[in-house]
Design a protein with these regions (language model features):
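Nucleic acid-binding interface residues in structured DNA/RNA-binding domains
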Residues: 2-118
Length: 118
């Protein structure tokens, strides 16, 4: 089976679409990888969101990567990265109980007032 190869500009375009959505997630809210993928026009590409966030170039500026979690309301990262994500979320008032974030309380309702961050 042949692996699909993506043209570099297509990957860059997808990553930029992902970054644009992540920039819109409001302070104190979270979104799932799948939600970000759908809103970026990449339905079913949750793993691509994770990969794009892991490979975020420095020139993208401040990107609130910590606001993206899995669909079960859990942090998917491990080790120091997971601790940093928890720290950042808690500093925004996001409550984490038994390793889970209540998506009803903190989930981003896309379409609400969430302007793009510069």
């Amino acid at each position: 089976m042949r692996r699909a190869h993506y043209h570099e500009s297509a990957v860059s375009a997808a990553a930029e679409a992902i970054y644009q959505i992540v920039r819109r997630i409001p302070y104190g809210c979270v979104a799932s990888y799948g939600q970000v993928a759908r809103l970026a026009g990449l339905p079913g590409r949750a793993r691509l969101v994770g990969r794009a966030l892991a490979e975020t170039p420095a020139e993208t500026g401040t990107l609130p990567w910590h606001r993206v979690i899995n669909a079960q309301g859990r942090i998917s990262l491990t080790g120091a990265s997971a601790r940093e994500q928890q720290k950042r979320l808690r500093s925004e008032g996001v409550v984490i109980r038994k390793g889970r974030i209540d998506l009803r309380a903190h989930g981003w309702k896309a379409g609400s007032d969430s302007p793009l961050l510069d």
